[in-house]
Amino acid sequence: MQDLKQIITIKGTRDGLSLFIDEDASFEEVLKELEEKIQFSKPKQDEPVVSVKVKLGNRYISGEKEEQIRQVITTDQRFKVIGIDSNLIPINDAKRWMDDSEVKVINRVVRSGQILEIQGDLLLVGDVNPGGRVVASGNIYILGNLLGIAHAGYHGDKDAFIAASYMKPTQLRIADYISRAPDYESDGVYMECGIIDTDQDKITIDSLKVLSKKRKEISGFERRMNNG
């Protein structure tokens, strides 16, 4: 069995205690040592409740095991857990973050009554016809005509933008901002994008060349769109 001192190390901080748990120890060993250390370090009844932060290192634990740790620490109500931190993230969270950071390239025409919705940035090679809708949690790039509805940053990302080779939408939405057809030129515009202007507190239309100076990450797409 490992030396108990190597399983859990307690360090005092201005906010309370930090518990560093050996990532190689079994969970059973961790719980056993935790019970002993908590009893030994328990403040007296007339002393304030102590805040505890648990550091797991490169160890991932389930919600059930996390709850077991909390119960051991708070069993006598002399400690309160203010955080359980790990250097690792659950697989589902990692996949979701990867989805949000990737650009989805889709070749199709979004026709009237159709909805195309994706996580992350969308690069649509094709048109959005009147009555069609494209929705993305990130930015929207359209190598084609935007004649329907586009909604970027639908999770609330106000930094998202919508760019199209030809823009004459019935509606643009970015986060919770909405801009309708009367806000645009009646004949439509080429190589333009919609972005939230924080000074005017609304969606405005600007050229892709201007936007590329503000958002360096779109420069590659801007060149592709300009080159057709």
From Swiss-Prot:
Pfam families: MinC_C (PF03775), MinC_N_1 (PF22642). Keywords: Cell cycle, Cell division, Septation. GO terms for biological process: cell morphogenesis; division septum assembly; regulation of cell septum assembly. InterPro entries: CAP/MinC_C, MinC, MinC_C_sf, MinC_N_1, Septum_form_inhib_MinC_C. Signal peptide: none annotated. Cell division inhibitor that blocks the formation of polar Z ring septums. Rapidly oscillates between the poles of the cell to destabilize FtsZ filaments that have formed before they mature into polar Z rings. Prevents FtsZ polymerization. Belongs to the MinC family. Interacts with MinD and FtsZ. NCBIfam families: minC, PRK00513.1-3. This is Probable septum site-determining protein MinC. It comes from Oceanobacillus iheyensis (strain DSM 14371 / CIP 107618 / JCM 11309 / KCTC 3954 / HTE831).
